[in-house]
């Protein structure tokens, strides 16, 4: 998928619309093309790489979040439509943050250089999961402990999760290097970032920004963990 980062009103409307076109409508159109063939042959596998963004919203990436939440809803509805076809499988992948050039390609209207949030996963791991699903279709596959944690945290404490995430992002942007606004690969192709990996895992903790973001995320995750534990204890006392 593609990402446009920034305060909502600072991002041109056509950029946000292209995010929806790529991340949501692209999947819908693809399904419309292949499903008649699947139904004719009575079997098939449709794999949607949604990302943890389908469960956990991204402040300063509102259109991206809309596309991912929308894609999750589309996929869930489609599974209902296909209950009469037990051998047609709709399989959703929810990986966490990956070491790809996606951030390099992103439209960026924050005025600052942005980086993926740690811990950063391997794209090869996701590729292996896709192969696994082809041989053993699963309706939902969450990849990585971080993705699983964020999903649970947002389901239990949505307001706290949003507040912590937004605070961490704002803290990072205050000290990040300034750069000019760019539409990235949203409106036009780019000739950079053509490798499989983005190189983020190797360089991240070497930078001050990386260390600060890691510290902020660690504090945020600790807060969410405490909230989860307290919520669990309260429910146990009331049960």
Language model segments and positions:
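SDR active-site lid
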Residues: 83-176
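A short helix-coil junction within the Rossmann-fold of NAD(P)-dependent oxidoreductases
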Residues: 33-42
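Hydrophobic alpha-helical topogenic segments used for membrane insertion/localization
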Residues: 208-235
């Amino acid at each position: 998928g593609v990402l446009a980062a920034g305060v909502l009103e600072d991002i041109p409307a056509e950029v946000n619309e292209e995010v929806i076109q790529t991340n949501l409508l692209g999947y819908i159109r693809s399904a419309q093309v292949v499903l008649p063939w699947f139904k004719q042959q009575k079997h098939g596998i449709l794999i949607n790489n949604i990302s943890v963004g389908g469960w956990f919203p991204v402040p300063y990436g509102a259109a991206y979040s809309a596309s991912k939440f929308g894609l999750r809803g589309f996929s869930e509805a489609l599974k209902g439509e296909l209950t009469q076809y037990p051998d047609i499988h709709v399989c959703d992948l929810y990986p966490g943050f990956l070491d790809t050039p996606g951030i390099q390609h992103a439209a960026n209207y924050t005025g600052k250089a942005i980086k993926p949030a740690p811990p950063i996963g391997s794209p090869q791991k996701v590729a292996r999961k896709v192969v696994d699903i082809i041989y053993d279709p699963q309706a939902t596959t969450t990849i990585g402990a971080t993705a699983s944690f964020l999903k649970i945290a947002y389901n239990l404490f949505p307001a706290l999760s949003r507040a912590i995430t937004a605070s961490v992002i704002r803290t990072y942007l205050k000290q990040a290097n300034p750069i000019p606004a760019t539409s990235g690969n949203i409106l036009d192709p780019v000739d950079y970032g053509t490798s499989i990996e983005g190189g983020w895992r190797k360089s991240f903790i070497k930078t001050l920004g990386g260390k600060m973001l890691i510290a902020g995320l660690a504090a945020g995750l600790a807060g969410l963990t405490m909230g989860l534990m307290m919520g669990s204890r309260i429910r146990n006392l009331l049960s």
